[in-house]
Amino acid sequence: MSAATDIVDAAVDAALVLAAEGTWRDISLRQIAEKAQIPLVDLFARASGKNALLDRLSARLDAAALATAATPSEDVHDRLFDAAMARIEAMEPHRSALTSIYLGRAALSLAPRFPRTARAILEAAGVDATSPRLIAMTAVWVRCAQVWRDDTGALNRTMAEIDLRLKQMRERLGKMGAGF
């Protein structure tokens, strides 16, 4: 791992701590650098704003979904479910911070990250991310992330939502001739 990667990852970790403790919109890059004990000039050279840190965080969380690619299962639904749940489980320890980030930003500014996550879930499941599938999986992911934010306890509501939405996605894509 390079020094640049270490700096950005340390800043992401610090940003998560600060977001869990406060309001995301009120947190500055300077505060993140201070919390991470990184000179602001070094952080700024590698991540010039909080969006860059959110991109790195999203990539780290997507890696959890991609790690399920080695999970053997004949059923595509099960592979998609496992990948989506791996992403959710990676998010779970950071629930307070992620909720602060979501509430502290316009939801639309987070939207560009959703297709990347959808692609990671599809690819982890061995499903070619064609345009219709990517659009459908993005819609599934957005809804499931909303349910997760409101879910408490053992994630039963989240798991049920993922299961339902994946079944609906498969059925609708099949009707369009874009199924898997």
Functional labels for PLM-detected ranges:
Residues 150-180:
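C-terminal peripheral helix-coil segments that are non-catalytic and often amphipathic
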Residues 4, 10, 14, 18-56:
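Helix-turn-helix
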Residues 19, 47, 51-64, 98-101, ...:
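Alpha-helical DNA-contacting segments of helix-turn-helix folds
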Residues 10, 14-22, 64-68, 140-151:
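Solvent-exposed, amphipathic alpha-helical segments
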Residues 105-142, 160-161, 166:
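Amphipathic alpha-helical packing segments from all-alpha helical-bundle domains
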Residues 67-104, 113:
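Hydrophobic alpha-helical connector segments
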Residues 10, 31, 82, 86, ...:
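Amphipathic alpha-helical interaction segments
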Residues 1-6, 179-180:
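N-terminal intrinsically disordered/low-complexity leader segments
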